């Protein structure tokens, strides 16, 4: 097969151009981060301003692609193992993991996948995405602080929170004095990979 060198060169330039365009619109330059083992992902439920119960997920899979110079290209996702939940009031474990709330026997994980990072100011971001809980997916917004760690350039200090209504995710409403609003929090550090 005898190819015209000009045609071959044009195809090469075209493919190179497509590759450059794809790299330009993907988070290719963003670094990959994972949560450190000391980070905490959990929730608290209050009633009349008093904390009724708090919980922390001990098994968390996480990844974030993030470049502070181009935060709009950032993305993050995490998966929480429901059975790894540790409660501030262990006596409520059966109720919290039961059918009326987490229904852990059927729904093994809670997950979040971002759809948009928005910079609000120095180290402040709004991370929109989809939270899946009990097989129900709803949009949520995490209000987030991501600050370079002063002692280690490979770490970002993070504090992030959102609030949901339990009944939006199929959890039984107004149960035994348990509040309808749930605060979900993440605090700790992201480590660059």
Residue ranges and their predicted role:
Residues 17-24:
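Bacterial N-terminal signal peptides
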Residues 29-193:
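Low-complexity, acidic/polar, glycine-enriched regions of mature
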Residues 2-16:
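Bacterial N-terminal signal peptides that target proteins for export
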């Amino acid at each position: 097969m005898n190819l015209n060198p000009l045609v071959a060169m044009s195809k090469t330039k075209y493919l190179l151009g497509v590759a450059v365009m794809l790299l330009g619109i993907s988070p290719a330059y963003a670094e990959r981060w994972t949560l450190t083992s000391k980070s905490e992902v959990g929730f608290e439920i209050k009633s009349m301003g008093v904390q009724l119960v708090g919980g922390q997920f001990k098994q968390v899979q996480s990844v974030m692609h993030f470049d502070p110079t181009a935060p709009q290209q950032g993305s993050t996702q995490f998966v929480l193992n429901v059975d790894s939940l540790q409660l501030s009031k262990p006596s409520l474990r059966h109720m919290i993991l039961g059918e009326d709330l987490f229904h852990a026997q059927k729904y093994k994980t809670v997950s979040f996948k971002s759809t948009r990072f928005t910079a609000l100011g120095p180290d402040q971001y709004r991370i929109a995405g989809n939270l899946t809980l009990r097989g129900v997916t709803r949009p949520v917004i995490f209000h987030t602080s991501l600050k370079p760690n002063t002692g280690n350039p490979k770490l970002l200090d993070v504090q992030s929170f959102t609030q949901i209504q339990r009944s939006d995710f199929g959890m039984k409403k107004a149960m035994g004095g348990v509040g309808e609003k749930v605060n979900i929090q993440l605090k700790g550090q992201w480590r660059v990979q």
